[in-house]
Amino acid sequence: MHFRSAETAGRSRRGIVPSESMSRAKPKPAAPKPEALRGDHSKVVIVDGSNVAFSSEGERGVLKNIVTIRDRLVAEGFEPIVVVDAALRHKIDDEVGYERLVDEGVIKQAPAGTDADYFILSFADELNASVVSNDRFKDRIKQYPALRKRLIKYMIVQGEVVFEKRTGRRE
C-alpha cells in the first residue's frame, strides 16, 4: 500500500490529474470496520527491539540480537513485529544494517520523541499478541493488565535464543 504526501496528492505518475476526472471518479466503498481488519493475529508477536538490542553488555545496541530473535520467531512459525525507539539508530553497532532493515520494514521505528513502549503495548493489546522483552513495563502495567500473561522473557546465549517457558501462571 502506498501513501501519497500532501505535496503529491492530485498528481498521477504522468503529472497533474485534471480536476474534472477527479470529480467523475466513482465513490470509494466505505472503509472496512476495524474488526474486519483484524484477521487472525494469533501468530503475531511484538518484539521490543530496543530492549533486545541492548540485552548484550556494552554501550551500543547489537543489531544481531534483533535479527537472532526475529529469525528464531519466524522459524517457530510466528510473525514478529519488531518495534524500536527512534534513538536506537544512533546507538546501534551496525547503522547501515539497521537502516536497511528499517527501509525493508523488518524493523518498525517509533516516531522521534515518542516512547516506543506505547506502540509496543498498543500493538500487543490491539492484536492480542505476546511481547518479547525483558522490560517489566511497571509504569504501564495498570493500563495494559493483560501484559502480565503475554510478556515473554528471553536470553541470548552464544547466539542461541532461549525463551521463557510459559506455564500460564503469572503473578
Locations of regions flagged by a protein language model:
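Acidic, polar low-complexity linker/tail segments
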Residues: 3-42
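Nuclease catalytic cores that cleave nucleic-acid phosphodiester bonds
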Residues: 42-47, 52-63, 67-171
